[in-house]
Amino acid sequence: EDVAFHIEDLPEATAELQQLLAHHGYDDACIYGHALEGNYHFIINQSFSSEAEVERYEALMNEVKMLVVDKYDGSLKAEHGTGRNMAPFVQYEWGETAFELMRAVKQLFDPKGLLNPGVIFNDDPKCHIRNFKPLTLTNAHVDKCIECGFCEVNCLTCGFTLSSRQRIVIQRE
């Protein structure tokens, strides 16, 4: 995920985000980003193989929402677009009036709801914890891949045959 805080809030917000991740058992979480823009990304190792793991993740995201929006008046999406993971929180962050205006604009351009249905505007408050894409375990190195695409342009073999991510997907299939 990527969130944004006001630059003057970064020291306190960073410490609280770290504490929040640790509180929920994400001791190996990685926070990085673009501090001059107040933009942070965080990556966690998350299994969704049990109801307890799904509940842990749901609790984390609810607290991230409150930390970013309520406490620091920040943004739940900074650099990357709103996806299914943040869809349940769009109205919370923007308020009902702005949310309904954005929904109306989407309806004007996509009256049949064909473009990314449920990605930004989703009436299911738990859409971020449903329909997970399971990743087949293959080996210790490949299993760490979260399919973010970073390797696509940074791999030495990029452009020779398959991309790094394509090779990983093939191993998983």
Each predicted region: which residue ranges?
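Ferredoxin-type iron-sulfur electron-transfer modules in oxidoreductases and energy-metabolism complexes
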Residues: 100, 121-142, 152, 158-173
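Flexible glycine/proline-rich, aromatic-decorated loop/lid segments
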Residues: 37, 62-68, 73-79, 160-173
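A glycine-rich phosphate-binding loop feature that marks nucleotide/adenosyl-phosphate handling sites
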Residues: 32-43, 77-90, 117-131, 158
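Local cysteine-cluster metal-coordination motifs and their immediate loop/turn environment
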Residues: 78-85, 142-160
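Activity-critical C-terminal alpha-helical subdomain
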Residues: 88-137
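C-terminal substrate-recognition/cap domain of FAD-linked oxidoreductases
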Residues: 1-59, 67, 72-75, 83-85
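Acidic/polar loop patches that form or flank catalytic/metal-binding clefts of enzymes
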Residues: 73-79, 102, 113-117, 153-156, ...
